[in-house]
């Protein structure tokens, strides 16, 4: 069974990335210290340096965890690590997105591959050596061993810092992409210092608190209120139906605020019909800008792809199905090599592009997604062990959520200039469901991936 699981996951993780690069085995870039196969102890507890978390509500303390800056030096092979990690997180992210969207066929969807990848790596830091193996396989950073009783471990901190380096490549204001992390542990357990450090590596600010879960309803209110306070009111009511036996809750959020590189023309905004499905039409404002774009008419996949610049390097890739074509069919074909071919085949064109104003927020239940992928039992369920997260026996990770917030305006860093040179633009009106990806252009990492079924909701 173990061999089957590994082979299935490894096949998905070995897909080509968004560029033609010399292949480097990911494990060699992210290995932990001296590469040796560490024995998996089945009986003896793993040694963990733990601390007591600050009780939630103590003097209304909402300050983030204090960062340890002693090990924040720049890493070697940074560019290569970013490129390789971008490929890995894109591959896993697209796979998870397709699982997620199967259950959200008729609703808007927003998913962050970089945020979920970081969440998994943070949880990996708390996993036992036995549980570390399926995590590494899913992430695509595993080195196989001929022995069943040992594992080659990766340096999770190195992975998380590389993810943050990818985020830092976004060349707008720092609050353009902001990541927050919350960890809530039962008050009768202590938490690993290493895990807390990983949450800090992963985020712009992290919060670790202990909670009395024996009073489940009261604990639920305290946890949700704390998240709302520390997210400036952006995030509300993440956790529901908590149990008195809860050991650990984990939540992360990523908030993207973007402006178009070239502004849309405010005077050209007009209310038009958006066809949600054959029975439903809504009236919404469509922004319009006429100018030069890079685009592709993919006749084989029956869609038009347009690149829209955001900051200097970050861009949106918008995918609009042809009239009568199925959005779901295009979603089912999403792979890193498909997106790579789209990007490579983009050509300059003169377009009159009309696009809905939209902002989007979504919440991903990671346990639910992993269950649909048939790996939750190994990673977070009954077979998962987290001796490196806490010193409490039979410690469980009960709920894991990823919150994604996406905001765009019609404003831009450059003013759109009208061109009156006699050319007739090709009209492209985004008046039906579409896909979009937010991509960091240096590493080609997909930061966000989503679909708009109805921009009015």
Could you tell me what each predicted segment is?
Residues 321-344:
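Internal alpha/beta scaffold segment
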Residues 391-393, 399-457:
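C-terminal soluble interaction/assembly domains
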Residues 43-55, 59, 106-107, 111, ...:
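Non-catalytic, conformational "gating/processing" segments within enzyme and secreted inhibitor domains
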Residues 14-113, 121:
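Signal-peptide-cleavage-adjacent N-terminal segments of secreted and extracellular proteins
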Residues 115-126, 130-137:
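Active-site nucleophile-adjacent alpha helix/oxyanion-hole segment immediately C-terminal to the catalytic cysteine
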Residues 118-121, 316-319, 437, 448:
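Structural recognition of the beta-strand scaffold that forms the well-ordered cores
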Residues 3-19:
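Cleavable N-terminal signal peptides of Sec/SRP-targeted secreted and luminal proteins
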């Amino acid at each position: 069974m173990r061999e089957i699981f590994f082979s299935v996951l490894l096949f998905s993780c070995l897909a080509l990335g968004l560029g033609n690069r010399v292949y480097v085995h990911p494990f060699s870039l992210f290995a932990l210290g001296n590469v040796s196969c560490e024995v998996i102890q089945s009986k003896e507890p793993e040694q963990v340096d733990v601390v007591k978390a600050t009780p939630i509500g103590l003097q209304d303390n909402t300050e983030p965890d204090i960062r340890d800056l002693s090990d924040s030096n720049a890493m070697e092979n940074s560019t290569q690590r970013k490129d390789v990690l971008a490929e890995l997180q894109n591959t896993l992210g697209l796979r998870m997105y397709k699982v997620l969207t199967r259950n959200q066929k008729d609703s808007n969807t927003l998913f962050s591959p970089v945020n979920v990848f970081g969440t998994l790596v943070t949880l990996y830091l708390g996993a036992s050596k036995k549980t570390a193996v399926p995590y590494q396989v899913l992430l695509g950073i595993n080195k196989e061993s001929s022995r069943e009783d040992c594992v080659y471990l990766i340096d999770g901190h190195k992975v998380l810092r590389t993810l943050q380096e990818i985020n830092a490549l976004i060349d707008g204001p720092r609050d353009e992409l902001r990541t927050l992390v919350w960890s809530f542990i039962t008050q009768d357990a202590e938490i690993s210092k290493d895990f807390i450090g990983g949450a800090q590596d992963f985020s712009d600010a992290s919060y670790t608190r202990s909670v009395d879960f024996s009073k489940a309803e009261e604990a639920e209110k305290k946890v949700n209120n704390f998240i709302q306070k520390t997210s400036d009111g952006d995030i509300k009511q993440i956790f529901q139906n908590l149990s008195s036996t809860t050991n650990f809750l984990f939540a992360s959020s990523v908030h993207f605020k973007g402006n178009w590189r070239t502004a849309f023309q405010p005077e050209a905004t007009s209310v038009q019909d958006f066809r949600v499905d054959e029975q439903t039409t809504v009236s919404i404002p469509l922004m319009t800008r006429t100018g030069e774009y890079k685009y592709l008419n993919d006749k084989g996949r029956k869609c038009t792809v347009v690149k829209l610049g955001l900051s200097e390097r970050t861009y949106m890739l918008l995918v609009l199905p042809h009239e009568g074509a199925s959005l779901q069919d295009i979603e089912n074909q999403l792979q890193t090599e498909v997106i790579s071919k789209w990007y490579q085949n983009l050509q300059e064109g003169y377009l009159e592009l009309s696009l809905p104003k939209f902002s989007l927020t979504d919440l991903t239940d990671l346990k639910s997604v992993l269950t649909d992928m048939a790996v939750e039992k190994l990673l977070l369920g009954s077979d998962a062990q987290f001796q490196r997260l806490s010193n409490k026996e039979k410690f469980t990770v009960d709920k894991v959520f990823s919150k994604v917030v996406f905001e765009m305006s019609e404003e831009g860093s450059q003013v759109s200039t009208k061109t009156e040179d006699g050319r007739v633009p090709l009209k492209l009106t985004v008046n039906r469901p579409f896909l979009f990806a937010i991509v960091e252009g240096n590493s080609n990492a997909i930061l966000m991936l989503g679909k708009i079924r109805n921009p009015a909701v």
